[in-house]
A protein has these predicted regions:
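Bacterial N-terminal signal peptides that target proteins for export
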Residues: 2-13
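N-terminal signal peptide c-region/cleavage motif recognized by signal peptidases
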Residues: 22-25
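N-terminal mature ectodomain segment of secretory-pathway/periplasmic proteins
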Residues: 28-100, 128-166, 170-174
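Acidic/charged, solvent-exposed loop-and-adjacent secondary-structure segments enriched in E/D, K/R, S/T
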Residues: 96-118
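A short acidic/small-residue loop/turn micro-motif
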Residues: 111, 153, 177-181
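Surface-exposed amphipathic alpha-helical segments
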Residues: 168-170, 177, 181-200, 298-318
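Pro/Ala/Gly-rich low-complexity, hydrophilic intrinsically disordered segments
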Residues: 188, 193-224
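Short, solvent-exposed recognition patches
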Residues: 209-295, 306-307
Length: 318
């Protein structure tokens, strides 16, 4: 009888272990399904609404209009308070209409998108660096949402919480949370209409009498600089920009793991201006600066200090 009992107990343990493994895989598949829905919804649905962006002590109110049809994507973002700003996406090109009303900054094949399109199209690599779990159900802008949490697997990124509309999957709220459990920044819709396409006329790109500033590249930064970002981060953008108050063009690099983003600016040292040395912060954005062979290197982003410091310290001139 004891042998029989041991045999049964052994199979019972294996059965429970198998059930737990299957249950874990099923939960992972369910989370991935939600994230895939959210990624597709932000790009493929028609919607319009107003959302609030909280970062540090600052608050901005923005209007988004998004249209998807046989011709592709149209998106318009308007800042509703303070200095007027407007961004217009026509498929992969983004036009930033500057406050002076005279200049438009054009970025072709822009990789980064605006909220609610915060998730990448390919999610497989993302889950190597985040542990994604389903939370409860909460309401945002009067709509029922599924909460999804993404906890970092290392110290190079913060945690994210997403509130996804249960009917469509569209992200209606997102929050970045640091290692102390405090909110770094948050987007949240106060009103949203999903399903009705905004008229094509609202996306008219008025360029009459305006000067278009193209981000240009005379020579790839990789030909001059060697940069090693944290694990999981890939370079997604590179440009040379003329920025206000800068005497020389600035090389701008963007690195992302698909969710977290950090930027790097490289410019010649201006002896008449004090450049940042060490770690600092601009509201919710961490900033790290150092000098390399007569150039100022600045890394910044809503990421842990370790990511900024290691990326900045990795920069070498070839």
């Amino acid at each position: 009888m004891r042998v029989g009992a041991g045999w049964w107990q052994g199979w019972w343990v294996l059965g429970v272990a198998g059930l737990m493994a299957w249950s874990g895989a099923a939960r992972a598949d369910a989370v991935l399904d939600w994230l895939n829905r959210a990624s597709a919804a932000a790009k493929q649905l028609n919607y319009s609404g107003v959302y609030v962006y909280h970062h540090g002590e600052h608050v901005e109110v923005l209007r988004v209009l998004h249209r998807a049809d046989a011709n592709g994507e149209l998106e318009k973002i308007e800042v509703l308070e303070g200095t007027p700003r407007q961004f217009l996406r026509i498929n992969s090109d983004v036009y930033c209409h500057l406050p002076d009303g005279k200049h438009v900054r054009l970025e072709r094949n822009a990789p980064r998108r605006f909220f609610p399109a915060i998730l990448p199209a390919q999610l497989g690599d993302l889950l190597e660096y985040y542990d994604a779990k389903l939370g409860g159900t909460e309401r945002v802008a009067g709509r029922s949402c599924q909460v999804v949490t993404l906890d970092p697997r290392d110290g190079y990124r913060y945690a994210f919480s997403l509130w996804l509309d249960k009917m469509t999957g569209l992200p209606l709220k997102s929050r970045i949370i640091n290692s102390n459990g405090a909110a770094v920044s948050m987007f949240v819709f106060s009103e949203i209409q999903i399903g009705k396409a905004p008229g094509v006329q609202v996306f008219r790109n008025d360029l009459a009498g305006k000067r278009i500033q193209n981000a240009s590249l005379d020579k790839p930064a990789s030909a001059i600089w060697e940069v090693t970002p944290p694990p999981g981060y890939q370079q997604v953008q590179e440009a040379v920009r003329s920025l206000p108050g800068k005497q020389a063009p600035v090389t701008h690099l963007v690195f992302s793991d698909g969710l977290s983003v950090l930027s790097m600016f490289v410019e010649p040292v201006n002896p008449q201006m004090q450049s940042l040395q060490g770690l600092s912060a601009e509201g919710a954005i961490g900033v790290y600066g150092r000098q390399v062979d007569g150039y100022s290197v600045t890394t910044l982003g809503e990421v842990p200090s370790m990511a900024l410091i290691e990326t900045g310290n990795s920069v070498k001139r070839k």
